[in-house]
């Protein structure tokens, strides 16, 4: 069982055991319960109210630490899967995981940049809260622009390290191996065969006497998919995302720089509130409170449109876009919905609508708790920029 896998992992480590090694062994032996423990702790950070000043920083710090811990758990689980001889028969990684895992293992620059941008993403809201509490609004906006500048620089470096392939929204492998699946992967081959025989009843053919596994009528398609290889399964990992052309690179740069441009426009708007009217921009539109929201949305929509045109040019040239290409473009398009929770649109339309829903929920017995939970998150959307950040 898992003890055998722990021994295999120990053989690969020549250094003396440390408390971290002991924790790794504990994690592998209790993989089934790790996910539930993480979920419970995250639920605590969700439920704790955000409207109390003494709690918001603590809860967001807890949430950030849990994300970092979860990322470390993913690394240990991936190492355990790689050390198991049964992994190939039970687990098939997704194209996203194959792609990101290859770059992390083969490109040190991508590895460190992806980790850095991930850690910055985990802690950005906490940093904004601390900056606002200690230095006021001006310090908060300087912190926001600094963080967005760091993330943009890291993503541009990652774009170059992939030789100008689209960046994955999540630059590291997702956790696809659950605790139960890890226990299955870690079992001996004999145990796996016995369990498979118990779970898959055999049907004996009357004429030849051969036996074949019975398949549930509703699961025929899923059964066949487990027996065949897709093109994504045999293609080289670094080819799972296509190379961008010149206009595709421009679209990717717009997507990377959009958060920084939007934050700078919001900062300029904040500064304009405290300066004389004579020093403001000569262009009336830039002085409008809607200017940052409109410009940011136009930049992001233009980037998505250009990425869609890149996929179309691939098809017209005879190249079939990969499944990961299409999934990434579709996922970015779905992120446009977050503009409902940003800037002047949120203040003018989304916020009043949500507060009216909260007021109605509080009048319905049994639903007041949900209204209070929504109100707690609206507190964060009202006061902090990174609450609605997606990159």
UniProtKB/Swiss-Prot annotation:
GO terms for biological process: peroxisome organization. It is found in: Peroxisome membrane. Its main location: membrane. GO terms for cellular component: peroxisomal membrane. Keywords: Membrane, Peroxisome. InterPro entries: Pex16. It is a peripheral membrane protein. Belongs to the peroxin-16 family. This is Peroxisomal membrane protein PEX16. It comes from Yarrowia lipolytica (strain CLIB 122 / E 150). The lineage of its organism: Eukaryota, Fungi, Dikarya, Ascomycota, Saccharomycotina. The gene is PEX16.
């Amino acid at each position: 069982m898992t003890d055998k896998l722990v021994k295999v992992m120990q053989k690969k480590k020549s250094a003396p055991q440390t408390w971290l090694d002991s924790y790794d062994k504990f994690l592998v032996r209790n993989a089934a319960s790790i996910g539930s423990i993480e979920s419970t702790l995250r639920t605590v950070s969700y439920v704790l109210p955000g409207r109390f000043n003494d709690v918001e920083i603590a809860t967001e710090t807890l949430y950030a630490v849990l994300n970092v811990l979860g990322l470390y758990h993913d690394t240990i689980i991936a190492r355990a899967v790689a050390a198991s001889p049964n992994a190939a028969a039970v687990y098939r990684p997704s194209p996203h995981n194959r792609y990101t895992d290859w770059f992390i293992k083969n490109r040190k620059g991508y590895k460190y940049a992806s980790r850095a941008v991930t850690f910055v993403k985990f802690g950005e809201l906490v940093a904004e809260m601390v900056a606002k509490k200690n230095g006021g609004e001006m310090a908060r906006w300087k912190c926001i622009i600094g963080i967005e500048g760091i993330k943009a620089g890291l993503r541009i470096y990652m774009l170059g390290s992939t030789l100008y392939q689209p960046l994955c929204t999540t630059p590291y492998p997702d956790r696809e191996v659950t605790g139960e699946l890890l226990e299955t992967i870690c079992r001996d081959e004999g145990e796996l065969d016995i369990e498979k025989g118990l779970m898959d009843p055999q049907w004996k053919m009357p004429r030849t006497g051969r036996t074949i596994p019975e398949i549930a009528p509703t699961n025929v398609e899923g059964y066949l998919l487990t027996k065949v290889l897709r093109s994504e399964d045999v293609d080289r990992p670094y080819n799972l995302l296509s190379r961008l052309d010149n206009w595709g690179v421009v679209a990717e740069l717009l997507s990377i720089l959009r958060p920084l441009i939007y934050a700078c426009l919001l900062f300029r708007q904040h500064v304009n509130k405290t300066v004389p009217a004579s020093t403001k921009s000569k262009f009336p539109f830039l002085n409008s409170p809607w200017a940052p929201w409109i410009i940011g949305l136009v930049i992001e929509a233009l980037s998505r449109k250009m990425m869609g045109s890149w996929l179309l040019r691939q098809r017209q040239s005879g190249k079939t876009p990969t499944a990961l290409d299409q999934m990434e473009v579709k996922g970015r398009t779905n992120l446009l919905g977050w503009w409902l929770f940003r800037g002047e649109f949120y203040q003018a339309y989304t916020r009043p609508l949500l507060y009216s829903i909260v007021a109605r929920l509080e009048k319905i017995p049994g639903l007041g708790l949900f209204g209070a939970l929504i109100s707690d998150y609206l507190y964060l959307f009202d006061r902090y920029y990174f609450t609605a950040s997606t990159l």
